[in-house]
């Protein structure tokens, strides 16, 4: 459902296009073209920086929430992030930048990033290429990326061969399944016992 702000934006574009169409009469096509350009520009502006959040939970809770907004402790070894929006040519670089910033912020502590993909309903070739390159770069730096809840784009990544190329052990139905896999691979019981997500590991 569109927010009131989005509805206002659309109304402004619609009214502007209508007024321009009238002003350009009898060359109505000029007003229509400008209206289309305004609509495309608004779409690109809104989707260039989608919501990217790191998730965590209250102690003992299984509900993931925005760690920053709720002042929750974050795990320094395994991070869970959520990205909401389409992943395409206009914002693939933004997603990559946010992932690399997360790694830089946690220095050498971070070993796994679990990406909650439930909020991604579309991905194009640019988005897929970015993900593929990001996986390779992060692996070389000692950080592995896992994906969870991929219902919206799973078929696309299977058809393109992305899943086979990068290994099916990167993909999980639930975030907790990916989390348990990460800690099992790490084999660091001491670090796991100190993680704010420790109650989800066992």
Question: Which stretches of residues belong to each language-model region?
Answer:
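The feature marks cytosolic C-terminal regulatory regions of anion transporters and related permeases
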Residues: 1-165, 183
